[in-house]
Amino acid sequence: MSNLCQEITLPTDPLTHIDGEGEIALCILSAINVGKLKSFDEMEELCDLAVRGLEELIDYQQYPVKAAEASTINRRSLGVGYIGLAHYLAKQGCMYDSPETVKVVHELTESFQYNLLKASNNIAKEKGPCGYFDRTKYAEGILPIDTYKKDVDELVAPEYNYDWETLRTDIRAHGLRHSTLSAQMPSESSSVVSNATNGIEPPRGYLPVQKSKKGPLKQIVPQYNTLKSSYTLLWDMPDNTGYINVVAVMQKFFDQAISGNWSYNPSNYENNEVPVSVMAGDFLNTYKYGWKTSYYQRSERA
């Protein structure tokens, strides 16, 4: 389990001494700027670079606590996610609540997870599987496309563009170098460095302000001049339905979790008050469509 962000869902085991035999979960994170993606032909190389780079960090870094070192070295858990999803959708001409958006996200995330798994499988062929591979569902030949909440099929048909059965066979034969591959972090700060939209979130405006210890930072959304009319702005969304569906389709493929949010603009409701029934409905829909975790429940000032 994680402390603040909610995307990490790794096993832990209590310890009573700093050098005890328990298990402290660590996850090595990275994100791919999908807003820069030109075609799915690039995804294989991008995922391979991300996985190989994080693979080297696991052995390179120092661990002050044995329980963290043993877990990380043996599980080699990675959490690769997205930044720039709003930019990517704007390039496709898709609003978050448009019916075609879930299909676009389905195709993107299938390519993403498939190529992450393929990269880890290739490294396992070179170096061997991770030490605790036999403790994973992957070792049984079980993939995320087998275990997702089937209610997602109401949103988008379970049609695939990649050869999952051959990948399943390769994983059972050679294993994976990493026990997990994907997790969606909030990425508020890292998106700024890459001049990308924040993670999987719709931007708050065309010129959102990122607060930091050194003061506010204004940053215009990518390709503002050409894509202004194609962006979904957070506080213009009438409700959370489209966003909930996007996250649900992503979670179908991710093997860890997603730090998803619920956002409310009080001006959309009578007396500037968000009804409890609306919030309860969002909670139930996230469960129905297979969200594993949620992060913030936030509102715009009325």
Where are these regions (language model features)?
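Long, C-terminal-biased catalytic regions of enzyme "large/alpha" subunits
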Residues: 1-302
